[in-house]
Swiss-Prot record:
Renumbered residue ranges of the record's region Disordered: 1-93, 126-145
Membership in a protein family: Belongs to the MON1/SAND family.
Name of the protein this chain belongs to: Vacuolar fusion protein mon1
InterPro entries from the UniProt entry: FUZ/MON1/HPS1_longin_1, FUZ/MON1/HPS1_longin_2, FUZ/MON1/HPS1_longin_3, Mon1
Localization (cell): Endosome, Multivesicular body membrane; Prevacuolar compartment membrane; Vacuole membrane
Compositionally biased intervals (Basic and acidic residues): 29-49
Keyword terms: Autophagy, Endosome, Membrane, Protein transport, Transport, Vacuole
GO CC field: fungal-type vacuole membrane; Mon1-Ccz1 complex; multivesicular body membrane
The keyword Chloroplast is annotated on this UniProt entry: no
Coiled-coil annotated residue ranges, if any: none
Origin species: Aspergillus fumigatus (strain ATCC MYA-4609 / CBS 101355 / FGSC A1100 / Af293) (Neosartorya fumigata)
Keyword Transport annotated: yes
Length: 621
């Protein structure tokens, strides 16, 4: 038998077999006279690959009945997105792809073009909203999700072959494409001071080792090279590192470019330039550029809340080498507590939204009416806040408080011990950059002692139990007017029993996932209403009591519409629509269909309880 007959045809896609080095031509037929014409024709047919099925223009993740778990396996390097984005979601879903080395490459696009996620697991539709006016809001409903539909949520994500998944001795699934997470790491030492430098400098090496052992650093520097604030250590101790960072930044600026981020090993550096200031974040906590940039923006807003933008600009225009430490004296604690909240995992920063205390709509309306009834002429904003959760707000028509401004206020009020001590009254000048970065407002703060009958002193009251009345006025001399309004408001709240309602809501705590969905596989969830810029979440108990565990579940990396991944400690599911964002965490062995069904039920529960969970409109004057 001729050995050439065993060779396979090499036909390129779309080749008609008529040119080049084709086998089965007349020349080859002459060499093999034993083959008939029909055999030759059959061989040519075998040489052609079968036609591919038509490629769809779009691929819906949620189309019923379409299941192709490995359809997104292949991706060319040309499909990688090179353009950065700060959007919460992007039109084209970014899917996790694996390269030849088994490492993650993301974001990439699937082979079928744009992937479109519907607004719900079962075609979420928006129903009629509330009454027109300032109370208007987006309403939505999520019908029941059947098992088959829940399956389809994950149908186009990578699925490991059953033989690729191994189980360790603890029963956890081992997925080689996911790195071991750091949820068991000890975070207690992260917030401990590194110590003071001795007069003779003998302990400098020890302090530098402690400084380098921290997982996260924040630096605020002037363009002239002066250190203004550092989260760990001081400018003198780490002056060498500061000099290196400034040199790198200056190198790019000299080339008419602006450096925004770079990596060195597993450490990420993000730089935000604000006029004469450089704000630098250094992180080994697997955070994205966007996350770190938002954190630096919040620290900058904290500086503006103390100085205002015109004052900051004037200081550096008169003297570019100004040392900003003295004007910011007293704000170091606020900067540090704000920075630590980012490291611990702040849901408010993570979602750029506020959390509200869950109470009945009628009870919240009673508090709103009390605020309106006792309002004085110089009032700009009035808030009742319980443990950092908003209970009620009164505001001018067509004016809303920026979530970033409220985050600064809550950080100042609930973290600064001087304000909270004794449960007394405070009158504080403050700039709200989101409202007006050019001037000061004046904030009256009074803490209510709800624990007087339980024998707990005001100084022992935890942040979660603290209730504050915050009244903001543009009038510098408005203290006594605000004090009078506070007294009248407390009298009204006691008369309509709102004080006890707030106390009961605080004592009740956040609901657990099993309170909401009995028998659910979920351990924790975060739900953000994008229309109201507010969020709600389940209790941390009992799975997420430590700082490291909480930080791990509040670490968002990808900008996608539907995302499911599994690590050695947890299974997570993210679902982003124009109406809401939902982030869920379950055990690593959780069934993905059960996870999707539980997520849908959480959405239904939130929408049933919407007016209890969120402040829609608030009190308006």
């Amino acid at each position: 038998m001729n050995p050439n007959a065993l060779e396979q045809p090499q036909v390129a896609p779309g080749d008609d077999g008529a040119g080049g080095n084709n086998y089965g031509t007349q020349e080859n037929s002459a060499k093999e006279p034993s083959k008939t014409g029909s055999d030759d024709s059959s061989a040519r047919l075998e040489e052609r690959p079968p036609p591919l099925p038509p490629r769809p223009n779009t691929l819906s993740l949620l189309d019923e009945g379409f299941i192709s778990p490995r359809s997104t396996r292949q991706s060319s390097s040309s499909s990688l997105q090179a353009k950065a984005t700060t959007a919460v979601s992007i039109p084209d879903i970014s899917l996790l792809q694996l390269n030849d080395g088994g490492k993650e490459n993301h974001p990439t696009r699937g082979p079928f073009g744009s992937l479109r996620a519907k607004a719900s697991l079962t075609q979420l539709t928006a129903s009629k909203g509330s009454d027109a006016g300032d109370s208007a809001s987006i309403r939505s409903t999520a019908p029941n999700t059947e098992l088959g539909e829940a399956e389809n949520v994950f149908s186009d994500f990578l699925a490991q072959e059953s033989g690729d998944v191994q189980q360790d001795s603890s029963g956890l699934l081992q997925f080689p494409e996911f790195r071991t997470d750091d949820v068991e790491d000890d975070f207690t030492s992260e917030f401990e001071p590194i110590g003071e430098l001795d007069d003779d400098g003998r302990n400098e090496e020890l302090l530098l080792e402690r400084w380098k052992s921290k997982r996260k650093h924040y630096l605020i520097l002037s363009a002239a090279g002066k250190p203004i604030w550092t989260r760990h250590g001081d400018g003198g101790l780490i002056s060498g590192y500061i000099g290196v960072i400034l040199t790198i930044i200056s190198f790019y600026e000299d080339a008419n470019d602006r450096l925004t981020s770079f990596c060195a090993g597993d450490t990420k550096f993000v730089i935000v330039t604000k006029g004469p200031l450089y704000l630098v974040a250094i992180s080994r906590l697997l955070e994205s550029d966007t996350q770190l940039k938002l954190q630096l923006e919040a620290l900058y807003m904290q500086i503006l809340s103390t100085l205002t933008l015109p004052s900051l600009t004037h200081l550096f225009s008169v003297r570019p080498s100004t040392d900003l430490k003295r004007p910011l004296q007293g704000s170091e604690t606020l900067l540090s507590t704000l920075a630590d909240s980012f490291t611990k995992g702040s849901p408010s920063t993570f979602l750029s939204a506020l959390e509200c205390l869950k109470i009945r709509k009628s009870h919240r309306q009673a508090i709103n009416n009390a605020l309106l009834k006792t309002k004085v002429s110089s009032l700009l904003y009035g808030l009742v806040v319980a443990g950092g959760r908003l209970v009620s707000v009164v505001r001018p028509k067509k004016h809303s408080l920026h979530p970033g401004d409220l985050q600064l206020l809550f950080n100042m009020i609930f973290e600064a011990e001087g304000i909270k001590a004794g449960g007394g009254e405070s009158w504080i000048p403050v700039c709200l950059p989101g409202f007006n970065s050019s001037g000061y407002l004046y904030m009256y703060v009074s803490f209510l002692d709800l624990r007087e009958n339980s024998g707990t002193s005001a100084s022992e009251t935890t942040t979660e139990q603290s209730v504050a009345i915050i009244l903001i006025s543009p009038n510098k001399e408005g203290f006594f007017e605000m004090q009078e309004m506070r007294n009248s408001l407390v009298e009204q709240l006691e008369k309509n029993n709102s004080i006890n309602i707030i106390k009961e809501a605080i004592d009740g705590g956040r609901p657990t996932t099993t309170d909401i969905v009995p028998g659910t596989v979920l351990h924790h969830f975060l739900y953000k209403s994008r229309a109201n810029v507010q969020f709600t979440m389940s209790s941390y108990e009992p799975e997420f009591t430590s700082i490291s565990r909480r930080r791990s579940i509040h670490a968002k990396h990808a900008h996608v519409k539907v995302h499911h991944c599994i690590s050695q400690s947890a299974s997570s599911f993210a679902w982003v629509t124009p109406i809401f964002e939902l982030y869920c965490v379950a055990s690593p062995n959780a069934n993905r269909n059960a996870l999707a069904q539980s997520a849908s039920k959480v959405v239904q529960w939130v929408q049933r309880e919407e007016e209890r969970l969120f402040i829609i409109g608030g009190a308006v004057f």
